[in-house]
Amino acid sequence: GKAVVLAVQREISKIKNCRLAEPGEFTKLAFQNGKINLLKAESIADLISAETEIQRLQAIKIMKGKSSDKFDELREKLLKILSFVEAKIDFPDEDLPAENFKKIKQDSLDVSNEINKILDDQKVGEIIREGFKIAIVGPTNAGKSSLLNNLSNREVAIVSEIAGTTRDVIETHLNIDGYPIIISDTAGIRDSKDEIEKKGIKLSLNKAENADLKLVVVDAKSIDLSGFLNDLLKNNAILVVNKSDLLQDKLDPEISKLNHVLISLKNNLNIDKLISKIKDSLKNKFISEEDILITRERHRQHLIQCANHLKNFSDKNDRKD
């Protein structure tokens, strides 16, 4: 038990020059002694904090070193380009072969293309590491909080018939088939004079804008997709028609054309179909055959800066030509 482990640790700590390691200390020492690079050190932290299978697999993929090898390869190419440029600056009177200029230009273009290919990844690595963001949005009293509770299998949000009960963003973490999900219940969107509710509505719209997927929940008895709802449904969205058990007529043909699902949270109807649609969105978002993954915004910014510098280098050479 835990008490036995603590007792053993306490006794070991009494031995001279012996102490408990700090969190991450062995990884830190390995990095400082050149046994692993920063990318691998970060992937160890990602592996320890992995909550889903896909996060675990991604961390292991990076630990195996293909990303590191690729970045080292690009670095070596850039160093060769740099050494040639420096030689030209230091010895301007030397007649360097014209073929060298052509090769340097081509090499810089090749590196630039490779970096841009790595950057064109739909941010899959970062989404896997941080979680796939889903925002539940829509008008008041449509069943957004009930949907969050249903998907979470627990009471996360307060449910009430009073419109405007949810005023802040409520987040919870889910694991759907190994995919990490951060799902947010947001304030119902409507015209309101209440300052606090207006701030909540503003947060809702911001959450929807930054989400990887929007679940736009509407009441089957009063479907009005004009205005803001129409904007929300333009991309990365599923129209969730709740209270479909009360639906008297067929859906409007225009609504039927949208990516939609009819559900009833009260009767637990078609929730499985909604989850299936969410899974399809996840699979489409997470598909990546590439072994080179960017998992942090810092990595992305460094690559963007490098690509910009190479573009400037190429543009200046083109002007000289």
Predicted regions and their residues:
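Short, Asp-centered acidic motifs that coordinate Mg2+ and/or phosphate
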Residues: I181, L213, I238
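Generic enzyme active-site microenvironment
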Residues: I183, V217, V240
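Accessory, often N-terminal, substrate/partner-engagement and coupling regions
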Residues: G1-E73
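Conserved beta-strand segments of alpha/beta enzyme cores
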Residues: R19, P180-I182, N259
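Conserved nucleotide-sensing/catalytic segment adjacent to the nucleotide-binding pocket
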Residues: Y179-E195, G200
